[in-house]
Amino acid sequence: MMRPVVVKEKRVNESQIHVVEDEVRQAKTMDRDIVTHAMKQSIAKLNPKVMIKNPIMFVVEIGFIITFILSFLPSSSSSIPGWFNITVSLILLFTVLFANFAEALAEGRGKAQADSLKQSKKDVFANVVKENGDIVQVSATDLRKGDVVIVKQGEMIPSDGEVIKGLASVDESAITGESAPVIKEAGGDFCSVTGGTMVVSDEITIVITSNPGESFIDKMISLVEGAARQKTPNEIALNTVLTSLTLIFLIVVVTLPIFTNYLGFQIDTAVLVALLVCLIPTTIGGLLSAIGIAGMDRVTKFNVLAMSGKAVEAAGDINTIILDKTGTITFGNRMAHTLLPVGNETIEQVGKWAAISSVLDETPEGRSVIEYVQAKSISYNRELAEQGEFVPFKAETRMSGVDLRDGTKVRKGAVSSVIEWVQSQGGTIPKDVNQKADFISKEGGTPLVVAVNDHIYGLIYLKDTVKPGMRERFEQLRQMGIKTVMCTGDNPLTAATIAKEAGVDEFVAECKPEDKIAVIKAEQDKGKLVAMTGDGTNDAPALAQADVGLAMNSGTTAAKEAANMIDLDSNPTKIIEVVGIGKQLLMTRGALTTFSIANDVAKYFAIIPAMFTLAIPQMEALNIMKLTSPLSAILSALLFNAVIIPLLIPLAMKGIAYKPMSSNALLGRNLLIYGLGGVIVPFIGIKVIDIIVGLFI
């Protein structure tokens, strides 16, 4: 006998359901508000002063005005009924409105994001420390660069700044959307704080780094809602080409009556206007601004703040990506794995001095050394180290350690740096130092040499692991024709092992901050565009030199000011996704341009026979779609020309499907889909519309 299966029902908290329902309801309301606002804006944008910024749609608007006026005048042609002019004018009006709606809808999404950011700019007060030590409470709007402010637990950080004293957990969810608080402390690369975020534990003293209107949130708001959006160079170039095409077709249409008069017949003005509108690239002309705005919007939704559309476009053209090993390719949590003594030294001696060099070292590596030594029960004098003077790690020296009171100098660091330091003090180098360092490097680890004055005791084996999926991601970049270069402070053997495991194309070992600039310039000298990530002040020059510099929001103010993109999630690997978004923007613009121009082929076969068949009967052979009548053919072509714009708005906003592949493969794929599709779709669309229109004519 089978036992009945008892299914336990998982109970969900009703309050959680209500929260989710409220969020969904708010999202729907926001979308509805954006659409309603876009509809109003599409009418407001009919102002000729606004329309002239888009020459293609401005020509369509002029066509609407001409045909609208003609609809109230006697027809010059007996073959054109009175309702034709008003019908053409209405179709042209809706063509312009659809184009305006596409742009307004894209702008509306940006303004919605700006409104949510403005909510985080509450009227807060700051505890300012005066020069005499007194604490005065002032409004955040009165703060100026250089003011020193104390922020306690539960208080809002009043403006952008850098921590100069203390350590605290900060809730940055208002900016990044990430609920987990982050640690901010004085010194290092994680001292930068953003106005509008909240201290959730402890207390910090910060120095203000921005004046009112110049804060990070202010910049975000102005970028996403700025009405005067600067067009990118590629957008300007494409707009110039499309405007030139429009001008050429305008000249053709204006001179056409001279040709027809010679043949002994006249073409009605409304028909000429219809011909012009169908010939010029109205589809891409109506969607061009929306594509650019939507591209910026996609980057922002990815929690990346782009300082300009140019930066997003540049990301799409990137040829080389410079990546830090630690934190980007690997997890960056290098932990002490084992100790290797050299010469006649013992593991206890290596552990003792390794621990002493790490007592004051608050880095994850330093802490891991202490934990390893304690786990192995190796004794060391902690008090001796605490009384000494800490020597912090620097990118230039690539060593850290402590100077004890009795004059003893203890160091741990990169092999070549410590060897050079020992030799400078007259010490000799044990023969097996390099041998054991090579062994660690070949294993993919990082060797740190431990030395006291002029004597080397041994090595610390630090082990790091490559993030899963990195090899596949780099392979995708390779398929796109993008070269990856890994920069690391590790020695060449360690760098080579990690590079091989991760699958990067090239690596630069023992890399210092100034070396990154040299790598970037070398690539740029070859005519390539370069992207890189960084978070420290020492990364700022390289971020400024790169064509796309992605700074981490957790990094220093100098790094964020030098970069042209800021990752609010502080995830260095996101540079790969940013490149993908940039490429998607360029591909969407190119694909819809191809589709728009290819559309003209079908329109030729609709309008040309309709215009000339009565005078030149042989033209009937071009009526391959077998359209009902000349008037139906013209109206069907115009209607398709208008309707295709709103149908393509979702594609313009979302972007075309993007798959990593070579430029030639992408070109072939898009020509097939949007080139051939741009020819076939209008034939089908115009014929269907003609059948419907034919029922009413």
UniProtKB/Swiss-Prot annotation:
Q: What is its EC number?
A: 7.2.2.6
The catalytic activity, as recorded, is: K(+)(out) + ATP + H2O = K(+)(in) + ADP + phosphate + H(+)
Primary site of residence: membrane
List where the protein spans the membrane.
Answer: 55-75, 79-99, 245-265, 271-291, 605-625, 633-653, 677-697
Specify one Pfam family: Hydrolase
GO cellular component, alphabetical, reads:
plasma membrane
Name the catalytic site residues.
324 (4-aspartylphosphate intermediate)
The answer to whether keyword Magnesium applies is yes
Q: Give, as one word, the top-level EC class.
A: translocase
Q: Which CDD domains match?
A: P-type_ATPase_K
Membrane protein topology class: Multi-pass membrane protein
Per UniProt, the keywords (alphabetical) are:
ATP-binding, Cell membrane, Ion transport, Magnesium, Membrane, Metal-binding, Nucleotide-binding, Phosphoprotein, Potassium, Potassium transport, Translocase, Transmembrane, Transmembrane helix, Transport
Q: Which residues bind ATP?
A: 361, 365, 393-400, 412
A single Gene Ontology molecular function, please? P-type potassium transmembrane transporter activity
Cross-referenced HAMAP family: KdpB
Which family, according to UniProt? Belongs to the cation transport ATPase (P-type) (TC 3.A.3) family. Type IA subfamily.
Question: How does the record describe its quaternary structure?
Answer: The system is composed of three essential subunits: KdpA, KdpB and KdpC.
Sum up the protein's function in the record's words. Part of the high-affinity ATP-driven potassium transport (or Kdp) system, which catalyzes the hydrolysis of ATP coupled with the electrogenic transport of potassium into the cytoplasm. This subunit is responsible for energy coupling to the transport system and for the release of the potassium ions to the cytoplasm.
Q: What is this protein called?
A: Potassium-transporting ATPase ATP-binding subunit
* Protein source organism: Bacillus cereus (strain ZK / E33L)
